Amino acid sequence: MDARTDKGYRGDAAQFFVAGELCRRQLVAVITLGNCPNTDILVSNAAASRFCHVQVKTFVPGNRTVSVGMKAEKDFGPTFFWVLVGIPIPDSGKDFEFFIVPAADMARAVAESFRLWASSPGAKGQQRDAVNNKVRTLSLPPRTETNGWSLEPYRNAWHRIINAVAT
C-alpha cells in the first residue's frame, strides 16, 4: 500500500496545474521537483530573458484556511510569487481556485496577522506561544485575516507573473 497522503498527491498535482496555467498564457514554466530551494516552478518569458520563482501551496476549495508556513513571512523579492491552489475533490462539483500573491504582499500580511494572533489571548485566556509556533495560515475568501487583509484581489491574478517576466 502506498504511504503517500492525499495531501501529498494534491501538492504534486498543484504544481502541474499551475505550470499548465502559466503555459496557457504563453510563458515557459519548469517544475523543479524539489531541486531548487523555495521554488516549485521557475517561470520565464519565451525569450528566456526574464525569470520569476513560484512557490505553490494547496488547499481544498471550501476550506477556511491554507497553510503557508513560516517562510511566507519573508519577502523574497519582486520576482517571487506564491500561488495558492484550491484543488477540488473529484466529482465534488467545485472549481479550481488560484490566488497569485507577490512575496512582498504575502510577507507583510502573514507577519502582521501572526503578530496580532500572538498578542491576543488564547481560547482560555492564556498567552499564546509565538516563539515555538511554526504554523502560519491564511484565511480563504470570503474570510479575511485579523488585520483585514483579503486574498480576493489576488484571485486569478495571473497578470502579476506575466508582467514580472515581460520584456
Region locations from a protein language model:
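Mixed-charge (Asp/Glu-Lys/Arg
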Residues: 1-37, 42-167
